[in-house]
């Protein structure tokens, strides 16, 4: 079972300029990169810029990754990477609220964008019904298929835990390994992007003591875990794969292990280092006075 999973499921989207306890102004607001990616699955320029005005951080880019990718199209993902029109704004004054926000991602939109203008979108459109009839593309049923963490459903993701939507949009479902190699060293706290609510997104590593930058840098752990028992009505066998990429690679009547569905996970406060939104308040290299930040884990 894969042990790399992004569990940043919730974003609190509230904008206010009346108070600004967590200003991100001046951090990554003057960046421009244009570099040709000669990977055989890309062969295009990766172009992105980050600027700002008085209120917002502004991203403009073409969504082309600036690093090596897997082979696309492939048998489980028949889509070709193509340039996108990425124009997004993020408040410079994000507001931390006490209530967990609404789930986002998947068909509802990106939860965050990486520095290179590639979106983070951990959710999928894959669904199963109670009878085990599943689809990887706009399926019906209440059981949400996870992109990572199991081998029953193959979305054709690459070494960056990413794949390509039918629109040609390359996007991350999990740890953007080769982007991290570009941005940081083997074990450092690395800012990889910005969430829809304006807070920064880091990946894998953080300080062992949240408010102590002199503490060791460690792999931060989520507070989500697999449930000990499946939910009532959960299908345990794939009876039919009705459509979407990869339908030819799965045989009916195979088991669906725990971890294949979003509903297989539960949040346990204090289990790991992070909260229900996979974030915490603490100091970072860019924010030595502290800020709320999300983690890709």
Language-model segments: which ranges?
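A mature extracytoplasmic/lumenal domain signature
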Residues: 94, 124-126, 174-176, 205-207
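Solvent-exposed N-terminal domain segments of exported/luminal and surface proteins
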Residues: 17-154
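Extracellular/lumenal glycan-associated surfaces
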Residues: 115-118, 166-179, 287-297
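Short, flexible domain-boundary/linker segments around small modular repeats
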Residues: 115, 119-161, 244-280
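Short amphipathic alpha-helical linker/capping segments at the junctions of internal repeats
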Residues: 187-200
């Amino acid at each position: 079972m894969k042990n790399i999973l992004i569990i940043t499921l919730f974003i609190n989207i509230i904008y206010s300029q009346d108070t600004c306890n967590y200003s991100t102004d001046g951090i990554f607001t003057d960046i421009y990169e244009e570099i040709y990616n000669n990977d055989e699955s890309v062969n295009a320029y990766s172009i992105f810029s980050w600027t700002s005005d008085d209120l917002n951080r502004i991203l403009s880019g073409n969504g082309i990754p600036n690093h090596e990718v897997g082979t696309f199209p492939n048998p489980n993902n028949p889509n070709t990477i193509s340039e996108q029109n990425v124009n997004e704004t993020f408040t410079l004054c994000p507001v931390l609220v006490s209530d967990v926000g609404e789930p986002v991602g998947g068909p509802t939109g990106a939860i965050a964008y990486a520095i290179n203008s590639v979106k983070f979108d951990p959710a999928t459109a894959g669904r199963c019904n109670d009878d085990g009839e599943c689809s990887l593309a706009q399926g019906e049923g209440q059981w949400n298929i996870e992109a990572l963490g199991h081998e029953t459903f193959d979305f054709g993701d690459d070494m960056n835990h990413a794949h390509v939507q039918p629109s040609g949009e390359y996007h991350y479902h999990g740890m953007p390994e080769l982007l991290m190699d570009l941005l940081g060293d083997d074990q450092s706290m690395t800012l990889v992007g910005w969430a829809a609510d304006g807070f920064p997104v880091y990946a894998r590593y953080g300080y062992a003591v949240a408010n102590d930058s002199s503490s060791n840098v460690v792999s931060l752990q989520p507070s989500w875990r697999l449930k000990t028992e499946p939910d009532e009505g959960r299908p345990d066998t794939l009876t039919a794969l009705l459509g979407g990429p990869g339908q030819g690679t799965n045989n009916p009547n195979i088991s669906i292990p725990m971890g294949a569905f979003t509903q297989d996970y539960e949040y346990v406060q204090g289990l790991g280092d992070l909260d229900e939104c996979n974030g915490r308040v603490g100091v970072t290299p860019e924010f030595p006075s502290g800020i709320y930040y999300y983690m890709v884990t």
